Amino acid sequence: MFGKLSLEAIPYHEPIVMVTLAMIALGGIAVVGAITYFRKWTYLWSEWLTTVDHKKIGVMYIIVAMVMLLRGFADAIMMRTQLAAATGGSEGYLPPEHYDQIFTAHGVIMIIFMAMPFFTGLMNLAVPLQIGARDVAFPFLNSLSFYLLLAGVLLVNISLGVGEFAKTGWVAYPPLAGIQYSPGVGVDYYIWALQLSGLGTTLTGVNFLVTVMKMRAPGMKLMDMPIFTWTCTWANVLIVASFPILTAALALLTVDRYLDFHIFTNELGGNPMMYVNLFWAWGHPEVYILILPAFGVFSEVTSTFAGKRLFGHHSMIYASGAIAVLGFAVWLHHFFTMGAGASVNTFFGLATMLISIPTGVKLFNWLFTIYQGRLRFTAPIMWTLGFMITFSIGGMTGVLLAVPGADFVLHNSLFVIAHFHNVIIGGAVFGYIAGFAYWFPKAFGFTLNEKWGKAAFWFWISGFYVAFMPLYALGFMGMTRRLNHSDNPLWEPYLYVAVVGAVLILFGIACQLIQLYVSVRDRNQNLDVTGDPWGGRTLEWSTSSPPPFYNFAHMPEKVGLDAWHEAKEAGVAYKPAAKYEAIHMPSNTSTGLFMGLFLTVFGFAFIWHIWWLVGASLVATIAVFVRHAARDDQGYMVPAEEVARIEGERMKALAKAGALPAGARVESFERV
């Protein structure tokens, strides 16, 4: 009845795991207790769990990303301390099979369940506002996408206490990932977590491409869109083009494991290298899916805090497109050692080097934007400046690895690990944190504490260099990745230094948590009354903070480049409307939540071969969707009187803050 599932699946013999599970259980009880005590279940259900508001969905994505950052970093610091402890005659404190699960989970979590939802959250929060839209093209699909991601998150975390996770590394290469060498459920957890979350990501890509193409404000040309919107658009093009490849590769691995096919096996006609090609045909575009939106954040931040129009706006768009296109022509550089031959390696090596050209264009455009600007050293701009230095180093090491001869020496060494973290942490993570600080007041109505934000930055950037620069040296010294023990005394000092760096990053994360607490505590002293705390240039800053659920009382018209800045310069930033009209909005729905819940059960049942539950959960998922489709809900109308009331309250607050243009009267904002 329960397939392969039994009480033996719970790792009672692993004290670290059991203590972690106990802490998670206590934390969960505390959260449920707090929600019950403050009687917030109804509010949580109606305002968040069933919402289709892109802004709230964006916030939920970011919350998931931050929770998974803590989980992924816990894995990272365990790996670093294990490697420092397991030298010479010592075996460290993690058994090899546990360590293997940790480094696999770390990679999967940080890329799929931390970085991706962080980017998606910022995109949900800002893009519709930047293009003057009231919501995304398919609001229900947006909700479903989030709950598909959450299904993958749940499966990854369930594997901690029920069964095991994959021991293959985050790439899950066969034949190691095949049923012969990984007969447990770990690889199955990996497959279904990635399949469900990947489906959600694909739907998000389609949703936002349609949103940008069809729902821009009247008069907003494509070339006038903010750079963050453009980089997200290019990222969504990559998502739609690449994620189906991952879906297909994992589906083929699934039939290998479940139905004894021989697609990626070493015998009976199978070819493991086909999986490697398919994986990286998705995997390298995935790197640019992560980094392009961060480039967009840096563009917005640089322009805003330099007080200047972004230098080379059009060239930024073309450079982003070039990066996206070239990103599909470089995947083989991940396995130059495969034996494809000198001609193939040369082509992919040159293509990899070419990507540095449009990336360099971006870097110089940011520098020229800063040049002669009146730079304000807020936390977002500090993350941006830290990125420029750190990412440049990571990019140069990437160009080195693009040389096939050098790659033959450094392949699978810690040099590659250092390079990858150099560009992902120094690029994507720094960018997302900058974007979080930049758009936080827009989402919540008050600014983050600057002192703690800057402290977090200094701990993060110093910790990064202390943690990962030694790994470059260790790579040159011959230390390979995925070791759980070393016996070379020359490596030990570098491993100890790397632990110190990880601890510094831990302090940085602690500062961010303190920053959140202090900011919420002191929110009344840091309110964003105007909706434009930074002196922004794009449309999202024309709305209140947080924006009303309908975003714009009137759709912006004749929107050009830096539309909000131009409106402020012309003195028409808060021009009163002649009258307000009713607004059509989509209704909340619980369908996405229940589909995500049933698909989580579906994945869990497939992992443990509980076939009756597979069928039941699939039928339930289809039934919930059919019920939703049959309802044909057309949404609802927000009365003009309600719109006028909300806008009137905002204008009174603006008048009190002295932000209204000269001669404007509050009464003029309340016409219906």
From Swiss-Prot:
Record localization: Cell inner membrane
Function: Cytochrome bo(3) ubiquinol oxidase is the terminal enzyme in the aerobic respiratory chain. Catalyzes the four-electron reduction of O2 to water, using a ubiquinol as a membrane soluble electron donor for molecular oxygen reduction. Has proton pump activity across the membrane in addition to electron transfer, pumping 2 protons/electron and generating a proton motive force. All the redox centers of this enzyme complex are located within the largest subunit, subunit I. Protons are probably pumped via D- and K- channels found in this subunit.
Residues binding heme b: 106, 170, 421, 481-482
GO MF annotations, alphabetized: cytochrome bo3 ubiquinol oxidase activity; cytochrome-c oxidase activity; heme binding; metal ion binding; oxidoreductase activity, acting on diphenols and related substances as donors, oxygen as acceptor
Membrane-crossing segments per the record: 15-35, 57-77, 102-122, 136-156, 190-210, 235-255, 278-298, 316-336, 347-367, 381-401, 414-434, 457-477, 494-514, 594-614
Main location: membrane
Cofactor(s) required for function per UniProt: Cu(2+); heme b; Fe(II)-heme o
UniProt keyword Calcium present: no
Miscellaneous comment: Ubiquinol oxidase catalyzes the terminal step in the electron transport chain.
Domain of life: Bacteria
Catalytic activity: 2 a ubiquinol + O2 + n H(+)(in) = 2 a ubiquinone + 2 H2O + n H(+)(out)
1'-histidyl-3'-tyrosine (His-Tyr) crosslink site(s): 284-288
Gene coding for it: cyoB
Family: Belongs to the heme-copper respiratory oxidase family.
Cofactor-binding details, from the entry: Binds 1 copper B ion per subunit.
Gene Ontology biological process: aerobic respiration; electron transport coupled proton transport; respiratory electron transport chain
Annotated membrane topology: Multi-pass membrane protein
Protein name: Cytochrome bo(3) ubiquinol oxidase subunit 1
Keywords annotated in UniProt: Cell inner membrane, Cell membrane, Copper, Electron transport, Heme, Hydrogen ion transport, Ion transport, Iron, Membrane, Metal-binding, Respiratory chain, Translocase, Transmembrane, Transmembrane helix, Transport
